[in-house]
Design a protein with these regions (language model features):
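Active-site/ligand-binding-proximal alpha/beta "capping" segment
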Residues: 110-142, 147-148, 169-181, 185, ...
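Alpha/beta catalytic cores of nucleotide-metabolism and tRNA/nucleoside-modifying enzymes
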Residues: 168-264
């Protein structure tokens, strides 16, 4: 990757974004734009099965440069979707376990439910691709994910849309990172708007971050080029922030660059 930033999985263009673009056009812009910027875009899953299909098709068209994220559906349904990601040559695949709280899925006849350790392990074993567990918010959840064989986790509260009063990812990230550092890749999302925000997340323990809503603006305003431009802007801002904090590389980011709340 050219930067520690990936495009987050997003679906629901019609009911979340005004419907000015089709689901297919939107996700192609995200996947193509991310690839043009030297990184990877994720695609999501939703109440309409066509949403996932659009994402997988976009990833296949981009030579596999993308990561599908599946809702926590029934085991056999998830396995079938993992197989489609595998056939598309995807870089990795995952399940957003906090999607179990999305009532719209059940209302649309697409039931979802929490996943146990055994169920996660079964899904990890059902694909040859690196497996990502998205929606981790506590250290014990992170341990379970890695014990089940996940290659990566995403510390995320689903954009604040599944549980009122849940803490932000940045609040819980340090404790989670401390519990599982070295066991796999730690990703995080939520509120990233500038390159300085990216650096903060890295200092809190993330290996890379996901960015979502701003890329909607990029896609609607400038298509794939708009997505790439926004990501490149983040990279430039991150580079500047690293220079100004004496950070030589993303692997050398230190918590020392953060100012403790107690001294503000």
């Amino acid at each position: 990757l050219s930067m520690p930033v990936l495009a987050a999985p997003m679906t629901g263009v019609l009911y979340n974004m005004g419907g000015k673009l089709s689901e297919d056009a939107f996700i192609r812009m995200i996947i193509e734009g991310a690839a043009a910027a030297g990184t990877i875009g994720m695609c999501g899953d939703g109440a309409d099965p066509a949403m996932y299909a659009s994402g997988v098709d976009a990833i296949m068209a981009q030579g596999g440069c993308g990561i599908p994220i599946v809702k926590p559906r029934a085991q056999e349904a998830v396995k079938e979707m993992l197989a489609r990601a595998d056939a598309a040559g995807a870089a990795a695949v995952g399940v957003d376990v906090d999607g179990a709280g999305l009532l719209v899925m059940a209302l649309k006849g697409q039931p979802v439910s929490p996943k146990s350790f055994a169920e996660l392990a079964e899904l990890v074993g059902a694909t040859k691709l690196p497996f990502i567990v998205k929606g981790v918010m506590t250290p014990d959840e992170a341990v379970i994910a890695f014990d089940a064989g996940a290659a990566a986790i995403v510390v995320s509260n689903h954009g604040g849309r599944v549980l009122d009063h849940a803490p932000g990812a940045a609040e819980v990230l340090p404790e989670i990172a401390s519990a599982v550092r070295g066991r796999g890749v730690i990703l995080a999302d939520g509120g990233v708007r500038t390159g300085a925000d990216v650096l903060k997340y890295l200092a809190l323990g993330a290996d890379a971050v996901l960015i979502g809503r701003p890329l909607v603006v990029g896609a609607f305003g400038g298509g794939a080029e708009g997505v790439a431009t926004l990501l490149q802007k983040l990279k430039s801002e991150l580079t500047s922030a690293m220079l100004l904090t004496g950070t030589a590389s993303v692997r050398a980011v230190s918590p020392r660059i953060l100012r403790p709340a107690a001294v503000r």
